[in-house]
UniProtKB/Swiss-Prot annotation:
This is YcgL domain-containing protein ABO_1767. It comes from Alcanivorax borkumensis (strain ATCC 700651 / DSM 11573 / NCIMB 13689 / SK2). PANTHER family: PROTEIN YCGL (PTHR38109:SF1). It holds the Pfam family YcgL. Residues 95-105 have a biased composition (Basic and acidic residues). It comes from the Bacteria.
Length: 105
């Protein structure tokens, strides 16, 4: 892609972790995963390619601020999207194995 077409945009690749559901790595498409620190890759596990896309500041992402994603990729070579926090209503529901136990009842 020519530089004129991508002015102010960023062509990226997105990878998901097989180890941690909901964890994704965004990287510059041309550089791939080579700028991601080894220690992070060790914790991320096998990186499965999901898609390639052009990040554009005027086009929002579902779970991350697109401008922050672009800035992190340009500064450090990657952006790590963490899994969303557990749904508090689901977490507190009766029968959830991790629901805190009340001892005053």
């Amino acid at each position: 892609m020519s530089e004129g077409v991508l002015k102010g945009k960023l062509f990226c690749s997105i990878y998901k972790s097989r180890r941690k559901s909901g964890m994704y790595l965004y990287v510059d498409r041309q550089k791939g995963l080579k700028e991601v620190p080894e220690i992070l890759m060790g914790q991320f596990g096998h990186a499965e390619h999901v898609t390639d896309m052009i990040l554009n500041p005027t086009r929002p992402l579902a779970r991350a601020d697109v401008e922050q994603v672009m800035e992190k990729i340009r500064e450090q070579g990657f952006y790590l999207q963490m899994p969303p926090p557990p749904d508090e209503d689901l977490f507190m529901a009766d029968g959830h194995p991790d629901k805190p136990v009340r001892h005053d009842a």
